[in-house]
Every structure is written in C-alpha cells, then in structure tokens.
Amino acid sequence: MIERHHPVVERIRVPLRNLGSAFEGFRVVQISDLHVEPNLNPALLRKAVDMINGLQPDLIAITGDFITHNAKVVADLTAPLADLKSRAGVFASLGNHDVWNAPRRITEALGHHGIRVLTNSGTDLTQGHDQLWIAGIDSAWAGDIDLPSALKGRAKGGPCLLLGHEPDYADEVAQRSSNLLQLAGHTHGGQICLPGGQPLMLPTLGKKYARGLFQVGGISLYVNRGLGTIGPKARFACSPEITEITLSNTSAA
C-alpha cells in the first residue's frame, strides 16, 4: 500500500517543570522503528532524513528497532542516517529486535554514523546555565533495564528526556520518576488500523499506549508510529511518522 511510502510530520508541544530559558522552544525530532531489513525502502529512509533536516531540529532521537532480524546489514542500510543534522546531536535507544539480534554490532554501526546509543545511561545537555538530562534505557521486553543508572547524574527535579522503546514501560517509569518525557515507539501505531486509527493488533508492552501523547502519572509519554513495517509490507490508516516535539516550561505552557 502506498501509504507506507509517505511519512507525515506530527507536531506537539510538551511542558516540563524547571526547564531553563535556554531550552524554551527546544525542538526534538523523533523517529522510530526503521526495520531497515527486510521491509524498509531505502528511498523512504533517505526521504525521511531530508524531511528531518528540513525541520532544522535542535536534537534528534531515534527510539529503537533499527532492524528486524539481520544485524549484518545494519551498517550499510543505516548509512543515510549519517547525514542527519542537528545542533545538539543524534541520540538513540535500542528496541527489542535490536537486542534479540546483535546489540553491540548495531551500537557500533550507529556510532560510526555519529549516533550515540544510550543504554541505561544518560548525559547532561548544557546551554548557558541551564541543563536538560538526555537518557536512554534498554528494551523492556528483550533487555535488562536499569532506570537508576540512566538517570544517575540528573539534577534533582530537573527536566529529562528519556528514550525507551516500549511505551507500556512508562507505567514503571512514572512510579519511579517525574518531570520527564519518555519517547517510545514499538507499536507502529498499529500499522494496520481501522478507519479513524483503531489498531487491529498491538505487540507485547505496546497494548496500553498505542500512539500519540499521554500523561502517565507525573511523566509525559509520546508514542511514535514508526517509519518501517514488520510482517506485511503495508500500512492502513496509520502513516509512517516523524515527530517534532517542542519543549516548554510548565509556567509558559
């Protein structure tokens, strides 16, 4: 179906407490679930890279499932990602398919393309006197999550951007943290949906939060519909997605 060849840009605004003025209006562009083999058309990935660069993002986040099964091809098939441009860098977390196959190979290949994979780790992004913690966790389905390690070093009460592939893990994150935006994928938004977007099938750890923006306790969660497909090479009522997220201070939201 031709829908899978035409990504759309979704734009949202997410407030975070204690977000410094230097990060007011900070724009994060997210993609997810590339599944570069066997189903992703290379032309679609190049098109997505061009669309992302056209948005001139401050930061790019990629939330896992770079492959489906064959990690040996990941370096070549993800080569267009080396052309991604953002002011603060490109960060990623791994998905369940990445972890089931060859997480080290994928992490190294992405690093070669200038993409920093965060697995149970984080880093402090500083602009002037203001800080934003960027963190990533392992796959909740296939890996071994260590959320405290991912958040270690974060300023108390400070704003945080967390890359975590499976959206339903947000319930656990919300019990252990707050003032945080989790970016997830995994569900493909359902991939094949009824008119209006009702998913016909959703994966483990993706059944509760299928697509879009949610408030989960004291955190926000955004679930991206992904770029690629798994199983049938088709999408219906569920276009591939590039998300532009603008951060704002709670008091300015």
Locate predicted features.
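Active-site-proximal beta-strand elements of phosphoester/diester hydrolases
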Residues: 25-35, 131-139, 161-165, 220-225
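Binuclear metal-dependent hydrolase catalytic cores centered on His/Asp/Glu-rich metal-binding motifs
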Residues: 108-115, 119-121, 127-172, 235-236
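Active-site metal-binding loops of divalent metal-dependent hydrolases
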Residues: 32-36, 64-66, 96-97, 121-122, ...
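Membrane-embedded segments
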Residues: 5, 20-118
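Short, conserved loop/helix-junction motifs that constitute active-site signature segments
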Residues: 55, 81-87, 152-156, 174-177
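N-terminal membrane-anchoring alpha-helices
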Residues: 1-22, 253
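Conserved beta-sheet core of the metallophosphoesterase superfamily
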Residues: 112, 167-246
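Short acidic-hydrophobic surface loop/beta-edge motif
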Residues: 10-16, 121-128, 212-216
